[in-house]
Amino acid sequence: MKMLDLYGYTSIAQSFDKICISIASPESIRAMSYGEIKDISTTNYRTFKVEKGGLFCPKIFGPVNDDECLCGKYRKKRYRGIVCEKCGVEVTSSKVRRERMGHIELVSPVAHVWFLKSLPSRIGALLDMPMKSIESILYSGDFVVIDPMTTPFSKGEVISESVYNQARDAYGDEGFIALTGAEAIRELLVRLDLGAIRAGLRSELESTSSEMKRKKVVKRLRIIENFIASGNRPEWMILTVIPVLPPDLRPLVSLENGRPAVSDLNHHYRTIINRNNRLEKLLKLNPPAIMIRNEKRMLQEAVDGLFDSSRRSYVSSRAGSMGYKKSLSDMLKGKQGRFRQNLLGKRVDYSGRSVIVVGPGLKLHQCGLPKKMALELFKPFICSKLKMYGVAPTVKLANKMIQSEKPEVWDVLDEVIREHPILLNRAPTLHRLGLQAFDPVLIEGKAIQLHPLVCSAFNADFDGDQMAVHVPLSLEAQLEARVLMMSTNNILSPSNGRPIIVPSKDIVLGIYYLTLQRAQAPDQEVMSFGELSHVEYALHEGIVHTSSKIKYRMQRCNSDGTIVSEVVETTPGRLILWQIFPQHKDLTFDLVNQVLTVKEITSIVDLVYRSCGQRETVEFSDKLMCLGFQYASQSGISFGCKDMIIPDTKAAHVENASEKIKEFSIQYQDGLITRSERYNKVVDEWSKCTDLIARDMMKAISLSDEEGKLNSIYMMANSGARGSASQMKQLAGMRGLMAKPSGEIIETPIISNFREGLSVFEYFNSTHGARKGLADTALKTANSGYLTRRLVDVAQDCTVVEYDCKTKDGVVARAVIEGGAVVATLDSVVLGRVAAVDTYNPVTEELLLSAGELIDEGKVEKIRVAGLDAVRVRSPLTCESKKGICSLCYGRDLAVGDLVSIGEAVGVIAAQSVGEPGTQLTMRTFHVGGTAMRGVEVSNLIAVLDAEVKLVNSNVVTDKYGNQIVMSRSCEVVLLDSVGNEKMRHSVPYGAKLYVSDGQPVKMMDKMAEWDPYTIPIITEKTGTIKYVDLIYGVSINEVLDESTGISNRVVIDWKLHLQGANLRPRLVLLDEDGNIATLYNDLEASYFVPIGAVLNVQDGQKVHAGDVITRIPRESIKTRDITGGLPRVIELFEARRPKEHAIVSDVDGYVEFGKDYYRSKRRIFIRPVDKSLPAVEYLVPKGKHTIVNEGDFVHKGDLLMDGDPDQHDILRVLGAEALASYMISEIQQVYRLQGVRIDNKHIEVILRQMLQKVEITDPGDTMYLVGEHAGREEVMRLNRKLEEAGKKPVAYVPILQGITKASLDTNSFISAASFQETTKVLTEAAFSGKEDPLYGLKENVIVGRLIPAGTGFIMNKVKKLAMLDQSDYATYYNSELREIMGDLGDELIAEGEAASPGRSGDGYLGNGGGVVDY
């Protein structure tokens, strides 16, 4: 469909559905061109007019000035379309100089550098020649045999010049055909028969048995298949004609000093034209061949420089003086390239920026806009109004009035900005709340005023931050700003669904102060009041204080609507606060009748939102803010040195710890513990000491003084306004342990605190951590920003496309338990999800949830009462929608608190939710000033509630002291309540002492087990005598003498380093009384393999008792964990990288058996399946690595066989996608939870869904796929449905996990991939394969200049589609596609339409009755 332009020439409207890219043929280049360029001249140096026939020729590219030919004969619009007979220039708009292309006819063909050097080399793949050979033909003057005829050469053989000359002497010029340069490559490409090559490769694939050869053949076959499908011709990769960019895209700009600034492209074109012309002249002179070859090589290099300077094989001899010239590729790629700089990131007009200041007098939907700024931003609106009212007859006069700031202008400005929202944005915009709409309020001054409550959403503070203002111009833009982006609509955070418009800092302090209750003297009478006005009078007169205890008669509404009155004990402050609460049955006085900290305030705002809706919440928040500020200033809370109270017990605690540390040193001197054990114990002891001092300090600081006043610093920290216990600990307790930059902990702590002041030595120790924090901040911000960019890129095309995909699948949601403690309850995990199946109460069998029902707060309460421990819910991972997700699989839109609406861009929201805290966290490493944040190691298991014990896999032996020692690697203690429901589950490590038995009842705080957290023991199961096998001094064990103690330990060393150690298998064997190897309970020999680094506790020939520790493996010294370690971990998980030393995962259920020999210095482990008919599965464990299974142990599919992090790809292969999801969610959430950041699981699931989009073909069935090829899951499933219908063999495949970078580059859209990374590579591949971009995602639509297919754009697309349908198809399309989106409105429009023209179903939906298209 073509649209006529104002000027009369046509431009294509945006009515395309997809974009296709392919290699341009010489014919198409000539067809696009308006003329050939043969001259390098640009402008005349005297007249500055453009030269004819040159690079800026007006005859080819169009006139320089609008409607004016070069010689000036025709100079008016009326001559438009005439070609001047004198100068040959067409009279038209000068805009055509941005569109019209020229071309250069090359005398000699030239290879396109992209297809030659972008790996894998496409020309090389088609010709089956290595890239080096092709380069030698193109650049070094080697020859290639085109037709050997009678000679012994083979076709395509590369020969040097000397060999060519000898052959020519021997066989004559006619004896064979061999060529050099691009002509030779072109000739080979022309002669290719791709169909025959494909058939040959397919037959070779069937016959070959070598895996290496198979991979090579598959790679080439895939390239050839793609090329055949694309419809390109091989010889098009060799250029015979080059297109020339329109001149206005490579302009000549004159600088202030009169010198011209020339675009780099013009240099490239000049070089090419010069060399091309020189070659043309040379050929006519018939010079020696070497001169021609040299000139052709130079032409090849010039063209390489134009297309891609970075891939040139030479460096120009003049490079030093000329500098690097940007090529066409450089203009596309990178942050400054065309894609990211101009297409995805445009500058915006009608915008301004200024410093922000606090505006406590504003309402939540308002912001203060300086008058001067508003005047400039709304200038056109003011002009039109002034003109309309007749105040200024012309625009010019209106502008003058605005400049001179006449009084009438201000009145008009007031009118213009009324109800006209503006957008405020603060960089960096890490999530969608970084850009919100406000109603402007005109203010004096030059700074923008911001409402204090939106600061946390913008992450803004008032220490000099700047913000940008944007004016939405069109009515649609204003409508979207008001309805969707207004700050009052952004009460909840999209990442976790909790309120983000929440009081903080001094507001919290004010409310905390207001709700405090002072301790009453025993003889003091409690005053009673019946009305609020009396309380206010008493306060005003100073009879009572806001925190005095009073009795008050409270009227409240029962659930049945009756009013009851009761007397409550409260304070005047709490009554004042109660006044601002909205009336609702769920909001009771108990909410206020307590001391409110930030946690309680947040949950109150949340409850008000859920109960009373958005409007009430906004009003309540504003009132809350005013109260908070008022009482924070009235309270007079200050911060003084004396407020930091140092506990009296500090000296005693430090003395105590020092004594214990001396003890550890003595144990170390006596050789009872190793160096690393001593270090770990010392660090642990100081951690305990610091915690004790901190506890005593908090106790001392939280007490009121003689006047009953609370400590100011305690109030600040306790209320959550500012500061934390760990900061207070450093101020008034003890700074504690510090970390080195490497992450290790320095074992001498800082005993002083900041009030006492640090000694020089202590200060020096503390600088490590503080400086590391600052360096980290700078580095990690970039890392985190890059992670967000990759996440957005991988998830940008994931939107909600339908209401229900009808899947029966889902994932099981459970509470998250870490280290025995519940860190995320089942309530929080299932809230806002949709039930996948009908769920019943296990006791009463009452239906709690029906399939497809949204789980809201009420349903969560039912689940909790029923005591369920797992619920199957719908998940984005199992959604079966095409091109997106359905509403039910996604569940609640967290920012609204209701089911997600169709068209929501959930992918981008997920990416922002995961990426935004990353940036926050990286900036937060130094807030605790580098003190080591590390908990005391867990060394025992204590019951946290009264329960009954159930032991799982508890294989125990009794040692000589009568202790029960756990011998199982998978022992678990489960705590059951009185009904038998599981309340907690703890794993007990191998070698622990167990104090409980199966079925035993335990009381809260009972110790159930304990173990040494710093070593992994190896323990005997039987009594007997130890014998060393393959433990040879100097080869596999060494006496390691500790210089500081003089005691030596026998330590296992790496025996592979010795020649005689190659076949050793160092182990300890247990002999029975007869001197034979003892057999264990599972009929296996009692032999114990020892890993490298193990310390032997027994001598050769020593008697041991069952349960004795014969070897111990020291654990690493524990490093501090913060997000610095956490962010790289998140990146590693999302990039699906294989961990360096990943654990081996068992593929089957079965029994462990150790191999008797080694394979290439690796130890064999066999898993014998339970089903004896199946073969054993073999695994190779690196020698000296500690296996966490014993011989004869039963392992389940997916269990780990050795220490380390498992590989995600293994989890997916062995256990499937659901297990992978649960592993990744728990690992990622662990990192964020450590920083107290809450992210909903569904965001991680959305990203995971995008990572699992591809499958690997294991059997191609009756298709053209190749084994091992990667294909889109949707595509394969669609193909399989067709194959099954046709009765053919379907494709077999396995899911694969791709990292986010790889998934982004592997997307269906080449435009999106090219704008992400590796631009030239992506475009080369796309053009070579003739790819189509269906324009489904957000990025590609932004790039082609359309409305994105999300939100409003999604609906508009659907409506436009409807408008294009035949009338007969309206109702069908509407019922299938639009009813669920448009709801009742659509039904009304259909009905209106039918009423307007009866008998024509759905016609009036557009056109007559309903004006949807006008909208």
UniProtKB/Swiss-Prot annotation:
Name the keywords, alphabetized: DNA-directed RNA polymerase, Magnesium, Metal-binding, Nucleotidyltransferase, Transcription, Transferase, Zinc
Instruction: Name its co-factor(s).
Output: Mg(2+); Zn(2+)
Annotated residues for binding of Mg(2+): D461, D463, D465
* Cofactor comment text: Binds 1 Mg(2+) ion per subunit. Binds 2 Zn(2+) ions per subunit.
EC number(s) of the enzyme?
Answer: 2.7.7.6
Respond yes or no to whether keyword Transcription is given for this record.
Answer: yes
Q: Name one Pfam family in it.
A: RNA_pol_Rpb1_1
| Catalysed reactions, as listed in the record | RNA(n) + a ribonucleoside 5'-triphosphate = RNA(n+1) + diphosphate
Question: Which one of the record's GO molecular function terms can you name?
Answer: DNA-directed RNA polymerase activity
Q: Name one GO cellular component term.
A: DNA-directed RNA polymerase complex
UniProt function note: DNA-dependent RNA polymerase catalyzes the transcription of DNA into RNA using the four ribonucleoside triphosphates as substrates.
Question: How the protein assembles, per its UniProt entry?
Answer: The RNAP catalytic core consists of 2 alpha, 1 beta, 1 beta' and 1 omega subunit. When a sigma factor is associated with the core the holoenzyme is formed, which can initiate transcription.
For this protein, the record's NCBIfam families field holds: rpoC_TIGR
Q: What is this protein called?
A: DNA-directed RNA polymerase subunit beta'
Please tell me the species this chain comes from. Anaplasma marginale (strain Florida)
